[in-house]
Amino acid sequence: MKHFMMPRNAILRDIGESQSPNPSLTKSKSQRKIKSSKENAPPPDLNSLIPDHRSSPAKLKSPLPPRPPSSNPLKRKLIAEATADNGVAIGVSDSGVKVIVRMKPPSKGEEEEMIVKKISNDALTINEQTFTFDSIADPESTQDEIFQLVGAPLVENCLAGFNSSVFAYGQTGSGKTYTMWGPANGLLEEHLSGDQRGLTPRVFELLFARLSEEQAKHAERQLKYQCRCSFLEIYNEQITDLLDPSLKNLMIREDVKSGVYVENLTEEYVKNLKDLSKLLVKGLANRRTGATSVNAESSRSHCVFTCVVESHCKSVADGLSSFKTSRINLVDLAGSERQKLTGAAGDRLKEAGNINRSLSQLGNLINILAEISQTGKQRHIPYRDSRLTFLLQESLGGNAKLAMVCAVSPSQSCRSETFSTLRFAQRAKAIQNKAIVNEVMQDDVNFLREVIRQLRDELQRVKDDKGNNPTNPNAAYTTSWNARRSLSLLRSFGLGHPKSLPNGDDDGDTEMEIDEEAVERLCAQMGLSPPAEDNNQEMSRVEKINSSLQTVVLKDESYNNSHLKSSEATDVNMEDACCQTENNGSETDNALTVAETMDDGSSVQPDSITNSLHSCISDTNQGNSPSKAENIPSCQDLVIEADVSAIVSVADTSNNTEQVSVNPVSPCLSVAPVSVSPVLIPPTESASPKIRNSRKSLRTTSMSTASQKDIERANQLTPEVVEPSPAMSTEVLNLYSALSTKKSEAFPVPTRQLAASLHRGMKLLDSYRQSTALRRSTFRLSYKALECKPSTVLSKADVGVQTYPQADEIAEDNSKEVLCSRCKCRAECDAQEISDTSNLQLVPIDNSEGSEKSNFQVPKAVEKVLAGSIRREMAMEEFCTKQASEISQLNRLVQQYKHERECNAIIGQTREDKIVRLESLMDGVLSKDDFLDEEFASLMHEHKLLKDMYENHPEVLQTRIELKRVQEELESFKNFYGDMGEREVLLEEIHDLKAQLQCYTDSSLTSARRRGSLLKLTYACDPNQAPQLNTIPESVDEGPEKTLEQERLRWTEAESNWISLAEELRTELDTNRLLMEKQKRELDTEKRCAEELTEAMQMAMQGHARMIEQYADLEEKHIQLLARHRRIREGIDDVKKAAARAGVKGAESRFINALAAEISALKVQREKEVRYFRDENKSLQSQLRDTAEAVQAAGELLVRFKEAEEGLTFAQKRAMDAEYEASEAYKKVDKLKRKYETEISTVNQQHNAEPQNPIESLQASCNDDAMAKYDEPSASDGDNQWREEFQPFYKKDEELSKLAEPSWFSGYDRCNI
């Protein structure tokens, strides 16, 4: 049994890959055989595929490159796929590493100790050992010679499209930095042309000169170059951006297309040598350097300067365009050093350790690459051991030309380091790099134009045949024959494969080796003959029939790429690849899907093919009629991946009948095969609404009044924003009318803007009220001049003379003629209010010119003030109307947002229903036709909703509101600051009020000086009764004191009236303040509502995103299931074919079928387990790395804990010592205190025991009489004197008692301890 099954495993794949006399079969099989290791890799040109006849007759091995080692598969992938990605023949350069050894000039004391000697241009000796390299530069060599050896070839390689790298290696102080960059000031502008310049400025000087020369030389090809540079350093295994030192500890990433790169690294474009010099100066200034005993400015880090040169050229003659990329890496490595020679300590010692470790890892990598190049034996390449090797892996054994400048010191003191450097250079010279030209050639434009022209002719011919012969009975056969011919035309142009697809990971793909000897041996054991040629011919015929029934898809190029990206990832055998064509800008975007149902190996059924193709093409031609054009939506409108803005194109396609006639039918009318799963349409991606270009312009006239502006605002806003468009369906109109009855739709204006506008409105209201209150108080002191009645000059106190009823009637008539009804009503109310509150009247008796002039000026000024107040009141009402309209618009936007939210909920429900339908279709519950009908109805309903949301988008209304408000503000500013605007009127009113006040002040002062009181203040008890006028005699009989007292009483009453008026104003101010607080609370409520709406919208968007992710996971699982089923079926078919060829029949055939099914299931299960174990291995490796990092962090933390514990123990010990010392000090103080108290008590006892002082006794004996009187007082004085002498001791006793208590600094010391 074992011998029976083993050969079968080798023929599970392509049993028909043996030699076939049929050339078409050989061509198709060779195409499958030469397929790249990448599933998504673009196939090479069909005309350039030549079968490989170098394989042995025993085994036909796959021409795929050998699988890369498991350590770094990506490195080898990039090299293996370079040819396939470019699409053209790429020049390959198989060259080794170029090594140049440069000897440092010896110092004065080292001239006699030189141990390195140059014996030829490419050889040197050290300790009687000879080393051979590409070139040797002796100590007398100049910078220009090094440039000619390394820099000039590097520039030419860069222009040719190769990647190039230059490494500077050697011990510290050997001249690496000088070779690469030159002296410290060599990069400045004044030193750019000196002889001491380094390799880098010379390289780029030549590079920019050659770029200019090439551009001028190939100007007809539109050749353009572009250079971008980056500069980084690797210090202590951390990458820092030298152009932006704030970017530290950058991470290295790896990508299939771009390879290895540093994340977030700064790249700057340069155009000339001056720009590049600035970058070099800036980067080298930020590089880490330090002083050692060997080198005063030793580099403490590796630095890498990278320049990417991109060129693009296009040939006008043949339409070919090429894109060439080359990368230049200039690497200045830190020098190796020994602690004995450099005397490094502290940070320098740590840096030296990291540098030596990094160089050791580089040397290990060089050894492995040299061994691989010499022996050809594959082994693990440790690129990831250090940041330097991981970053520069393309330069070391990859796609680059490498030149290495090894700097050595010929002195005896550096013998070991020099010898180590030369051995490193010798091993590096053995490395073999494979540099290729990084060039991408695009397809021939003229060829594609010819293809498009022929395809157009074919399509037009098919349409003409169908239109000219509508009743021809042979039309179905002709149509199917035309479809076959069109398919052959497409295949002849080579459009059956995608032009370019991204490369995928080929991990897990295995290519089987088909052993023909084992097949023949199996046939001999079973007594069967080998496969005959007639079977091969039959298989070729079946292959032809299957290939002729492929699906023809005409789509947009971008959508085709994205579709093939997902579909080709699931196909194992690309037998049924989609045919693709490229469209010009005016070509169709829709798709025609034609597919037939047919079992493998069966004959062709012309009737089914004819019927299906006939139905598809007839549906296509029916789209020419304008009446049905509206019922056939374009594929662009039904494909969910399209932009939301493209949905509006339904109306355009309904009017454009020519476009509808060209476009094929939508995918919902296509016939899908039974054996192929239906194409799953992904859900709509949620896109936040964005304001594009507003085509509405709201213009206001500067001469329109407030009422006219209100009317225009109401007329403009309603029809443009609120009314639905005629293209909306009846259902959407009903829904819109139901929603419009509640509140207006609104989209919230930004919170800060709304708050600012309301705050500005409140300020205007406050200023208006304050100015109104001030004007009212001024009016009430204007002595009845507010009625706009002309004043009369009176010489006598005659009441009848002063009333002037005719003048009053004339004034009233004039006011009626000038003022409108609204202003007249407001003026009458103000006049009535003023008449109610005013109690003062002016009774002029002087006939002088000043009095007459002032009496006529007063009414004019008051009229102007009154007109200004009315005008400002109207402006405020207009402002309030604007605010009310804005509030209504905001409410309308809120309602509209609610409607959009409901539409989103409906769309989400549609997505869920779609998922349910897909699951039902997969389970077989729902038939394919029902699924297509329900899907079409769902898409049409969703299209209506999206169209409704597009036509009534909230942000459109918001934009209009913003534009209207800005225009109104601009208009108000123009009206205020313009000629004869509000500003001029206000200035004129202020001037009139000042003149009026000055008039009253002057008249009152002059009358008081001449005749005393000229004002007669009367008080009216009845508000409606006119105040009485009293005559004032010419001569004053009463005394001045009585007159003054009367005037004082009158002014006191007037002052009380003013106080009551002030109280009323204060009450009104409080009311307004309460109203403002209420409005502020309402504003806060609106803000909270807006925030809640925003949060709800965000939650809805997040839910929609989660729904899309779930659908994507479901679709991925579905695709995986289909791929697994397809692989099982292919395995069964292969085994059936092998059994049919071997002639197995009857029971053996059933056994073979069962065995094939089991083998296929086991194979799929094994692949699944392999993928599972691979993923688990990766996860375990990542967990292991995380665990190692955690263990390292825990070790560091444990060390810190131990240090902290030692510090704590030491602190506790110090605290105990301090407490012991403090207790001892307390004991000493107590002891001293007791001793002192004992001494004090002894002295007091001795003092009390002695009766008197000896001196006093002698005086008493001399003067008995005198001392008899003063005996007792002298004794008391002596006692007091002794007490005074001992008083300091008592004070010290008190201080000691104080010291006995715990001092303030004892606790402080404890805290510090």
Curated annotation (Swiss-Prot):
Gene Ontology terms, cellular component aspect? microtubule; phragmoplast
Origin, by domain of life?
Eukaryota
Q: Which residues bind ATP?
A: G170, Q171, T172, G173, S174, G175, K176, T177
Q: Which PROSITE patterns match?
A: KINESIN_MOTOR_1, KINESIN_MOTOR_2
Q: Where are the transmembrane segments?
A: none
> Per the database record, which ranges form the Kinesin motor domain?
96-431
Q: Which UniProt keywords apply?
A: ATP-binding, Coiled coil, Cytoplasm, Cytoskeleton, Microtubule, Motor protein, Nucleotide-binding
Where is there biased composition of kind Polar residues?
17-26, 699-708
Q: Which InterPro entries match?
A: KIF15/KIN-12, Kinesin_motor_CS, Kinesin_motor_dom, Kinesin_motor_dom_sf, P-loop_NTPase
The GO terms describing molecular function are: ATP binding; microtubule binding; microtubule motor activity
Q: Name one GO biological process term.
A: microgametogenesis
SUPFAM superfamilies tied to this protein: P-loop containing nucleoside triphosphate hydrolases
Ranges in coiled-coil conformation:
932-1003, 1062-1130, 1167-1241
Give the protein family. Answer: Belongs to the TRAFAC class myosin-kinesin ATPase superfamily. Kinesin family. KIN-12 subfamily.
Give a short account of what the protein does: Plus-end directed kinesin-like motor enzyme that plays a critical role in the organization of phragmoplast microtubules during cytokinesis. Constitutes a signaling module in association with serine/threonine-protein kinase TIO that is required to support phragmoplast expansion and cell-plate growth in plant cells.
Subunit note: Homodimer and heterodimer with KIN12A. Interacts with TIO.
- Put simply, this protein is called Kinesin-like protein KIN-12B
Origin organism of this chain?
Arabidopsis thaliana
